[in-house]
UniProtKB/Swiss-Prot annotation:
Similarity-based family: Belongs to the plant dirigent protein family.
SUBUNIT field: Homodimer.
Location(s), subcellular: Secreted, Extracellular space, Apoplast
Protein name per the record: Dirigent protein 2
Lineage of producing organism: Eukaryota, Viridiplantae, Streptophyta, Embryophyta, Tracheophyta
Protein species of origin: Arabidopsis thaliana
GO biological process, one term: phenylpropanoid biosynthetic process
The encoding gene: DIR2
Amino acid sequence: MAKRFLLLLPLLSTILLLSVSVTESEAYSTTKPCQGYKPDKFTHLHFYFHDVISGDKPTAVKVAEARRTNSSNVNFGVIMIADDPLTEGPDPSSKEVGRAQGMYALTAMKNISFTMVFNLAFTAGEFNGSTVAMYGRNEIFSKVREMPIIGGTGAFRFARGYAQAKTYKVVGLDAVVEYNVFIWH
């Protein structure tokens, strides 16, 4: 058995080396530039984002914090995971159009600023089943904040654009935020 293996070892080594060299030499040939692609649609979305931290059924929960967080006046180091409803109107009972699923972290040491990583997953209407990926800085005490749209799925493939967030209402730690999202796709 060992002799057979020793006889096959050079053959297996050769096959492995050839497969590695073929893989490396073809790495760029599998990716072709997208020639002449131009986004053909522009979409403006308007909805309200409900971030609920308090109560029996929170939609955002703290999953981590740094040891120094309690000594920070801006909660630096806190990480939250969220599955927040997106609705047509500012009232939490208005029609739900999707969910903001992702996380945000308090990443500034001198002010309250989040780094937001969210998929806006649409569950109703024309864009049901589609998502938009949003990633960026959200300095929550600024009147209007802008975050980039970096991709999407379904109707929003190849999406790019930006989202503008404006705080509508804050009660304790819970917030309702108005969003205007401008997407080329």
